[in-house]
């Protein structure tokens, strides 16, 4: 068995599933699965505000979305990340403004790097705070925070034993309470 981790966008990962180049893919909704595939939710996490360390809002414990109305945003492009993009847009619209997107980046690591360089601020999945990026501060969103959803997609049938075991293990990691009750 060989495990290879590849970072890509949802459309590319689903193409990899269809072409049998990928056995299990972590994808973000919305997406359309062909009938031979299935998916299940593995993560529903609040998003955080990513700020350069010298930003005035980095001194606060938590930040309401409305406080970002005059900020420049660095976001994931909608065509390759509609779920994250729409969650951020909708949260900002509920707070009374449309985010001023001055830069888009196709990978979360690039977004974090651009924020650290002072290009703008962003709203990112909470897991990004564990990436060890230097020169960046993360703050919880005060009030109604958008959520980042992550699903595991895989072939419904015709999976190798290794792929079946990987799906089972990942399912147990994502839902330990269900595994304990089984």
Give, region by region, the residue ranges found by the protein language model.
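Central regulatory/effector-binding core of bacterial HTH transcription factors
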Residues: 1-34, 104-105
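A ligand-binding cleft/hinge motif common to bilobed small-molecule-binding domains
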Residues: 26-35, 85-87, 94, 108-136
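Hydrophobic residues within well-ordered alpha-helices
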Residues: 16-18, 68, 113-119, 152
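Flexible hinge/capping segments at coil-to-helix
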Residues: 36-47, 51-73, 164
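A late-sequence structural motif
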Residues: 74, 127-129, 136-182
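Short loop/turn segments at beta->alpha junctions
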Residues: 9, 64, 106-107, 125
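Structural detector for helix-capping/boundary residues
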Residues: 8-11, 20, 45, 66, ...
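Residues at or immediately flanking beta-strands
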Residues: 2-4, 98-102, 137, 149-151
